[in-house]
Amino acid sequence: MKRLLIYIIGFVLTTAVASAQDYETAYRALQQQFEERSANTPALIKTYLDQYPYTPYSDEIHLMEGVLHAEKEKYKQAIKAFSKINAKNLSRATQPMLHFYWGYALLKQENYEKALSYLLRVKQKESLYTPHARYYAGYCYYCTKDFQNALTEFLSVQHLAGYQQIVPYYLIQIDYAQGHYEKVYERANQLLDTFPDNQH
């Protein structure tokens, strides 16, 4: 009887270790596919979750799922995936990605107040997403007519590539809304001088 019990315990432990190695290897492969934005990543995510429903990487997997949905402009599905995540289980380096994409998806659903709550978290620590979070936070403030905070955020990114041509338009509109007509004239002339062929 004792020998049988030892055999059973040994079998269970061996199986558990093999299973842990399997889901670990599969997760690393999935992570690589996600980083490369491989076309079959959504199918691999589904297969992984079906095969390993109790994986300790479920939060990371749902993050990948949500990001892919957001990038394909499927914002409701992105929000649904993000809501399955316990952000505390993600690494500190990964949390800005969650908060940025969640905030962005909410912004695209015109839920500006809630979007701000996520975008402002990204600003707390400098990351790849910080300048983009500042711009979209500015946009949320702008849409809710909180022009002073919008101005602060837009000014913080106005000189960054990708925002140099669009931000001045918001600054001009904010100046106009606040009755700063001299600034409107000054910014408009500066914009035309700097970007005469701007399509915005």
Task: Pin down the residues of each PLM region.
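Acidic, polar-rich low-complexity tracts and alpha-helical solenoid repeat scaffolds
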Residues: 1-5, 10, 16-200
